[in-house]
Amino acid sequence: MRKVVVITIASVLAIFAAQTSSHAAPVFDGLWATSKKDCRDKDGPDSKTFIDLDNVIKGKPAPLVDQYENHCRVDRKTPAGDGLVLSTTCFEFWDDYNKGANGRKVTIKLAAGPKDTIRIDGNSYRLCKRKDELPRKR
């Protein structure tokens, strides 16, 4: 009987651990750049890339990858090794993004890197700020 209780408790703990890890925030969410200089908060073209795979707009999931004049709605996420392949529709202007007009299909490959780095389409990016460190209004 004691063995059954121990097995039951171990099983319950394993289930809770699996559920907790499956809800962990994606390592890709946040503000990234290819250099520390590009992490500065300034307007204009640079390598800053904002990734929010849990983004919600008007109560609906709306994951996005946002770069200077390149606003991408994530249509599909496919696991690939230690990363993801994102099938996206990208727009040059926010107005087009909001209207869903003049989009182009783009595939974006994300891969985890060493501490606070990722690779976006093979290029190394460093973490500027985690998503929860950024202002809510973007």
List PLM regions with ranges:
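Bacterial N-terminal signal peptides that target proteins for export
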Residues: 1-9
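C-terminal segment of classical bacterial N-terminal signal peptides
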Residues: 14-22
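Short, solvent-exposed loop/hinge segments that bridge or flank secondary-structure elements
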Residues: 28-67, 96-99
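Sequence contexts marking disulfide-bonded cysteines in secreted/extracellular proteins
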Residues: 38-42, 71-73, 89-91, 127-129
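Short aromatic-centered micro-motifs
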Residues: 65, 118-119
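Edge beta-strand at a domain terminus
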Residues: 119-138
